[in-house]
Amino acid sequence: KWYGIAQHMAHIVLDSTDVVILTIFSSLSSVSVYSVYNLVTNGMRSLVLSVGTGMQSLLGELIAKKEKGKLDTVFARLDWLIHTVAVVCFGCTMALVVPFVQIYTSGVTDINYVQSLFAFFISLAQCFRCIRLPYNVVILAAGHYKQTQSNYIVAALLNISISIFTVIRFGLVGVAIGTLVAFVYQNIWMAHYISKHIVCWPF
């Protein structure tokens, strides 16, 4: 139980780090810009994550029945599906989010909402966040909370430390870089872990 709570707390830190760091080390105008872009990327993330709804119970059943062949097949298909949907959705987001924000904030002159570099990094970070879904789902289905809690804690610490270091110099882009590094780390760590302990999946 406590290992699951630790993972949940680390997840909350990953979710709220950007706004807190921007509030402390940057300005409220940066928080305002971040919130507008976050509105779009969160919507796309919810769309991608909905594709994998209900898969944890199926994977858990296959693990419990020790149906290794079916587990590997289902996981491979889920992984391919999520990767494809995430890349397509966030590729479109990278291309269209700035024009959308320009229309959404038309008439606002006190803040420059056109932040193309930030849009690129935050979209890429959220793409990697979605790509880790199959790994996260199969880990939870297998009940490997204790074995994987260090991954969540390290990712949260990476996000905090890198964001603080880079936000002072790069502002909005800095927190997006911190988030991106944290999720890239999680993807690599989780992919390596499940390939060794849960599914037969080359990594």
PLM region spans:
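C-terminal transmembrane helix end/exit motif
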Residues: 138, 180-203
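Membrane-interface junctions at transmembrane-helix termini in multi-pass inner-membrane proteins
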Residues: 123-154, 194-196
